[in-house]
Amino acid sequence: SKTLKLEKDDRNVWKYSFEIPCDSQGTTVSWSMHDDENTAKNIGRETSLHASVLLKEKTAEMNNILAQEIPQFRCSDSKFEDIYYYLWSLHMMYYINVQKGWEMENHTQSAVNNFLGIHRYDACFQIKVGAWARNKQRFAYGNVLTWKHLVENGRYRETQNGHIFLSDNKGVGWHSGAYGGELAEHVLGAWQIYQHTGDRGFIRKCYQGYFRKVFWKNMVGFAMNDAEVGRALEKMAVISGNNSDVDHWKKRINQDPKHLRLMFDQRWEANGHKDYFMGGRNGMLMTNAFWAMRSKHFPREYAERMIHSWALNKEQGFFGEFFPLAMAKKSMSFFNSADDQSFGYTPDTAYFTLDGIFSQGFPRIASDLTLNHLKNYNFHKEWKIPVAPEAYKRDLSLFGDQYSNFNAGKILLFLEGLGGLSYSIPD
């Protein structure tokens, strides 16, 4: 093609671009990846040749999943229905079942064209989305248990004080060199799956050789969820037949109400940021202050002040062209790097922030802000169709992957936030 452009970047990574004509009849573009070049080419070629048949098969498959596997949703405003089912479609289409090496469980991913597979951070909400599918063994368990392979094979980073971190992503026999500590949130996701199933065998698999190992010496919490995770580990210990572990978790993770209140009080208005939680010394104010509201121990009076001072504030706060900006307007002029510009609005920060406001018992404010976000972030006004970009730049132009399961947390905003749904089979 005369429009094909190939070039290497400064890291010797090949990049390409091309243009193809497309009229009202449409055109087919196929993309395939395989360790063997010829196999990849043949798959792509066969897909293009049989596109119509394959499209009908995929449509039938997805219609069946959307009709039989997920909670049904209806709304007087059809665009919210479109968004809901579109986000579920992406989440479900990205499931893979490799059955090799460290990929023995069926699990979702964050993008179709992403060889990096499932991401540790993204799984914090993707695990919980899977808990709402009907077939939990197919759509829920693997999002948790696929990470166990790294622990069983000693593929983790352990600090001198006993903190264990897993890589950002992994595959059949590899893992990345970027490590982080969001696994505490995975524990709560696994517990929600148990609440929706009562499957004690699943909890045993999660606890023995995995969560017990990761948190035994020390624990890194996520957005102040330490107490909730500690309580979940105690329950998992009992369910898995490790009753003697309960005392260990009680000593390891302090759940004393006075201690918990002190942890929040010490971080309130830190570094002189009025009505703000855990603000940094450098003045970069991000939405993660709201994420801590997801803890039931977060003082509600603090939440109310922060919501009115920062969430609803269109001058200095997080209400931009819509809610929420990833960074407060007060900080944006000081932090203006290329990355800051690219990630002006992001789906993960929106989920954690709005979930926090719902959790604190402000349903009207949380609902209004959620609807504001969904109709501006996940519905294209010009195209009149749902969208799921990885991010919007500060100037509202699209950024990154345009079919991103990084938006999966919004499904939880529909079900648990707007719908207020919650259930526990064991209880």
Report each predicted region and the residues it spans.
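Aromatic-rich carbohydrate-recognition surfaces in CAZymes
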Residues: 52, 59, 114-227, 343-366, ...
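Extended glycan-interaction surfaces of carbohydrate-active proteins
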Residues: 78-117, 140-178, 214-220, 258-345, ...
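Aromatic/acidic polysaccharide-binding cleft in carbohydrate-active enzymes
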Residues: 367-408
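The feature captures the catalytic groove of carbohydrate-active enzymes
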Residues: 14-48, 111-112, 159-185, 208, ...
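A glycine-rich beta-turn/hairpin centered on an aromatic-Pro dipeptide
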Residues: 412, 426-427
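Structural helix-adjacent loops and short alpha-helical linkers that scaffold large soluble proteins
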Residues: 74-84, 97-99, 130-144, 176, ...
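Acidic/polar, glycine-enriched structural segments that form the non-catalytic walls/loops
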Residues: 1-114, 200-207, 212-215, 235-251
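Catalytic cores of large soluble enzymes that bind and process phosphate-bearing ligands
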Residues: 32, 72-75, 79, 225, ...
